Amino acid sequence: MFVNETTDDRGQVGIGTLIVFIAMVLVAAIAAGVLINTAGMLQSQAEATGEESTDLVSERIDSTTAVGIVSETEVSEEAGADRGELEEIRLGVSGAAGSDNIDLSETIIQVVGPQGQDNLVMADPGDDEIDANDDGFVTVTDEDGNVDGDSTDATDADPSHIASGHFAVENEDGNFVEESDAVLDNDNGELTIILNPKVAPFGSQISESDEELDLQDLDTEDAFGAGDESSLSIVSPSGATTEVELNAPDLFSEDGEAVRL
């Protein structure tokens, strides 16, 4: 009277279902791989952006002072000089708080001045001497405006010898420094950038010329002077930019004085 129930039914999966399952697993694996690669790329980009942001902060240059030295050259009224002019522009620079070493030889100064615009790079005075015949950065002339065939000690050069397209760097002793020494670090907490106001884009003297500014023709050869303005962007090697505005007073009261720009 007992009934023995047996079940011979078994679960079966169709081949189509199995194919779909395998396909889903493969798609999930591919998607996971894509997500992992994307996450890695985003992490790398984030790290690179973080490093760039850090460099922009750690390699920023501070401009501490901006002064101009009034030329002591006397020009008569017959020469057409109806206003003062500068013989050099001096920018005191230092590394911003917490900054790393900053190489001024790799720094660019973008200038918009009365005579146009230009990108200035550092002029290296060389190891021991500056040769007047090099296509370099310092031109030495005699009293008659002729190119001096001899060479001169780098520390004896003055700002009027800096060609357009360049700037010089001066240490605390008042001497031009070489590229290897133009570094803002613990030893050089502050250096001075020297600009020549006679050459473009500050003045109108032609950069290729080997002659000094002709003070007898100020109508066509004008130096940066009273009432002039110029905008500077000092770009460090990392790309950090410091903006500096130069505004000369409308009147220079005394030759040889230092005026705030």
From Swiss-Prot:
GO molecular function: structural molecule activity
A GO cellular-component term linked to this record: archaeal-type flagellum
GO annotation, biological process: archaeal or bacterial-type flagellum-dependent cell motility
Proregion positions: 1-11
Any Pfam family the entry gives: Arch_flagellin
Principal subcellular localization: other
Cited InterPro entries: Flagellin/pilin_N_arc, Flagellin_arc
UniProt keyword annotations, A-Z: Archaeal flagellum
Cellular compartments annotated: Archaeal flagellum
Family membership: Belongs to the archaeal flagellin family.
Function of the molecule: Flagellin is the subunit protein which polymerizes to form the filaments of archaeal flagella.
Record-given protein name: Flagellin B4
Source organism per UniProt: Natrialba magadii (strain ATCC 43099 / DSM 3394 / CCM 3739 / CIP 104546 / IAM 13178 / JCM 8861 / NBRC 102185 / NCIMB 2190 / MS3) (Natronobacterium magadii)
